[in-house]
Amino acid sequence: MVSLDSSVALISSSDAPVFPAPVLDRLDRAEIWCREHGQRLTETRRQVLGLILSDVKPSGAYDLLAKLRATHANAAPPTVYRALDFLLETGLIHRIERLSAFVGCTHAIDCGHGCDHAQWGVHRAQFLICRGCGKARELEQDSVAVVLLEAARAVGFQPESATIEIEGLCAVCQRKDKAADSDQA
């Protein structure tokens, strides 16, 4: 068995990645969501989404390409970029601009209250990005986005997307920094 990382394993070089059960569940829900909205989650799109959902950190396009090549030796950058474009357009993933990387959207298929987020009109997200460990966490604070969208509309601006990226240190990295500081004292 060849391992891509601790969360994704390959049975052989010609097989698709085997994802953990929670990722498989999200992939199945994404496939249903796509079908209900007249879209098709192809096998390549599903694999790229699965790789993104399996990673604890935002995934860059070339990192995704390298992982995809483990199962599809002939995968090329356009293959990954087309899949990423589709996943972005459907709102299943977000692009974190400052990292030039991608994360799964926690609202599109996981909000837990049956919302049709395609009806929102403006895809909105807020991210906390840790400069220590590189992890990104999507916030579920619609009130932040609503205030910004209302302010934009008040001046005649029609928003199409709204993403806020806040960089800092997560709780784990803050504890590590404090421990390192106390060791040096």
Model-derived regions: residue spans:
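Pre-recognition alpha-helix immediately N-terminal to the DNA-recognition helix
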Residues: 46-51
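A short acidic, leucine-rich amphipathic alpha-helix
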Residues: 63-69, 80
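Short helix-coil-helix linker/hinge
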Residues: 41-44
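Short capping segments at the starts of secondary-structure elements
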Residues: 55-60
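Short coil turns linking two alpha-helices in DNA-binding domains
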Residues: 76-77
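Basic amphipathic alpha-helical segments that dock to polyanions
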Residues: 80-90
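Short, Lys/Arg-enriched N-terminal segment that forms or immediately precedes the first helix
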Residues: 25-37
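Non-DNA-binding regulatory cores of transcription-related proteins
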Residues: 88-90, 94-185
